């Protein structure tokens, strides 16, 4: 799984600036989708071939006893417990503060690898910056400027060396013995553990790896109708006798790790509750990660016709950016609707991994343009020439032509819908990238 880097520090030391610098590559990949809710406290970064998750914990007040500061401190402690590396940020311009000492006292007791980072160090001598902070007892401070990027690359490379050294070896992605990797995600009490037991059943379990610590992942390999699957734990599921129970509190970090590791995500909602911001945040991360998706609306059996209509309208209104995914109305407890749900998992995975030949893509593009031309921007009308596939999981379609920066978001969504219809790309995000050139065939040699 992707390692987790937690950014910790008192307010206004530059955590958000460092977070934005570490995760900027992700922001550029996904266009703003209508209704998409993002939680800016969580993001993904990458150095070379090494991806990682970043958690910005907010201002940390370790001794806060109540109110919003107490809740923020609780969330910070949970993030620290689940992080592979903690980056403790202090302010080099203002020097050591009493609150820094309180945070350092707490962090030393956690047993986590701690990187002490002195921010806002631009234009200052290292010795002058670092001297004050040695007394925190966290080793050599690392001087950076999050705003200008100075020292950030070296720091994150060091942090990733430590983080990846503690990661277990993962199975080969192409290992045929491993099935489709499924993450079942959702807020607490929506029925995740009930769905797990309905899917797996005692006789279908092939292997179960009990984790050594609460930070390790559970992978459950199982078969259903002759097909292999691997379930990734997202909810702190632990085995009790012959069933799994959710015995841990909801963990954002584990949810994000599981989504990143999955081939297909099942977003489980509670039909008897309104869709929350937390549901939308989880859904937004699924889209940003480009994961295939199926929506399960659980506890459907307990609703009358009026309540069902209301639940469907709520789903359409609040999660409209998930219109590429199929929704299934199920009862995990009564095991109804689960067969159709799993067929959609298979379809979503097939769509995410689909191979799209260049001649067929180009033909679909030309037909779409003939049916509806892109609008002019001033005197310029975009010319869309040909298309090829640039990647899978999710599918990336690269369109070549002239003046493509004039293509509107509305027309881009029109093309996406045409490609989805032509190639049956249901259940997966679809990326479209435009590349303009004077001679659209110049790079086809």
From Swiss-Prot:
GO terms for molecular function: ATP hydrolysis activity; GTP binding; ribosome binding. InterPro entries: AAA+_ATPase, G_ENGA, GTP-bd, GTPase_Der, KH_dom-like, KH_dom-like_a/b, P-loop_NTPase, Small_GTP-bd. Keywords: GTP-binding, Nucleotide-binding, Repeat, Ribosome biogenesis. The keyword Transmembrane helix does not apply. Pfam families: KH_dom-like, MMR_HSR1. CDD domains: EngA1 (cd01894), EngA2 (cd01895). It comes from the Bacteria. GTP 2 binds at residues 186-193, 233-237, 298-301. GTP 1 binds at residues 9-16, 56-60, 119-122. Gene3D superfamilies: 3.30.300.20, P-loop containing nucleotide triphosphate hydrolases (3.40.50.300). The keyword Nucleotide-binding applies. One of its GO terms (biological process) is ribosome biogenesis. Residues 3-167, 180-353 form the EngA-type G domain. Residues 354-438 form the KH-like domain. SUPFAM superfamilies: P-loop containing nucleoside triphosphate hydrolases. NCBIfam families: GTPase_EngA (TIGR03594), small_GTP (TIGR00231). Belongs to the TRAFAC class TrmE-Era-EngA-EngB-Septin-like GTPase superfamily. EngA (Der) GTPase family. GTPase that plays an essential role in the late steps of ribosome biogenesis. Associates with the 50S ribosomal subunit. This is GTPase Der.
């Amino acid at each position: 799984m992707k390692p987790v880097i937690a950014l910790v520090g008192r307010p206004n030391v530059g955590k958000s600036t460092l977070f934005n610098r570490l995760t900027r590559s992700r922001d550029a990949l996904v266009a703003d989708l209508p209704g998409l809710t993002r939680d800016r406290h969580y993001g993904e970064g990458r150095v070379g071939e090494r991806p990682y998750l970043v958690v910005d914990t907010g201002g940390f007040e370790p001794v806060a006893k109540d109110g919003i500061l107490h809740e923020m401190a609780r969330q910070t402690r949970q993030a620290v417990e689940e992080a592979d590396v903690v980056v403790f940020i202090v302010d080099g311009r203002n020097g050591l503060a009493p609150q820094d000492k309180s945070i350092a006292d707490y962090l030393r007791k956690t047993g986590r690898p701690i990187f002490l980072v002195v921010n806002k160090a631009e234009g200052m001598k290292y010795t002058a910056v670092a001297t004050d902070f040695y007394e925190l007892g966290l080793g050599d401070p690392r001087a950076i400027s999050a705003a200008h990027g100075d020292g950030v690359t070296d720091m994150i490379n060091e942090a990733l060396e430590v983080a990846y050294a503690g990661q277990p070896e993962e199975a080969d992605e192409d290992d045929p013995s491993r099935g489709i990797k499924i993450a079942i995600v959702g807020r607490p009490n929506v029925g995740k553990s009930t769905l797990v037991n309905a899917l797996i059943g005692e006789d279908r379990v092939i292997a179960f790896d009990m984790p050594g610590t609460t930070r390790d992942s559970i992978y459950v390999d199982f078969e259903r109708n002759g097909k292999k699957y691997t379930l990734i734990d997202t909810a702190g599921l632990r085995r009790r006798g012959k069933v799994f129970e959710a015995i841990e509190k909801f963990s954002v970090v584990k949810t994000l790790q599981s989504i990143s590791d999955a081939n297909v995500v099942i977003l489980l909602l509670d039909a008897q509750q309104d869709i929350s911001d937390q549901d939308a945040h989880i859904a937004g991360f699924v889209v940003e990660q480009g994961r295939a998706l199926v929506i399960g609306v659980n506890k459907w059996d307990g609703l009358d016709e009026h309540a069902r209509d209301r639940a469907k309208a709520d789903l359409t209104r609040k999660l409209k950016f998930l219109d590429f995914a199929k929704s299934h109305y199920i009862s995990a407890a009564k095991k109804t609707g689960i067969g159709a749900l799993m067929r959609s998992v298979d379809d979503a995975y097939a769509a995410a991994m689909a191979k799209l030949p260049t001649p067929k893509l180009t033909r679909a593009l030309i037909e779409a343009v003939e049916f509806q031309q892109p609008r002019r921007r001033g005197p310029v009308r975009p010319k869309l020439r040909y298309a090829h596939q640039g990647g899978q999981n999710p599918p990336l379609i690269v369109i070549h032509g002239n003046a493509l920066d004039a293509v509107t978001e509305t027309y881009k969504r029109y093309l996406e819908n045409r490609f989805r219809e032509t190639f049956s790309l249901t259940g997966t995000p679809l990326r479209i990238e435009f590349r303009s050139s004077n001679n659209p065939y110049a790079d086809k040699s």
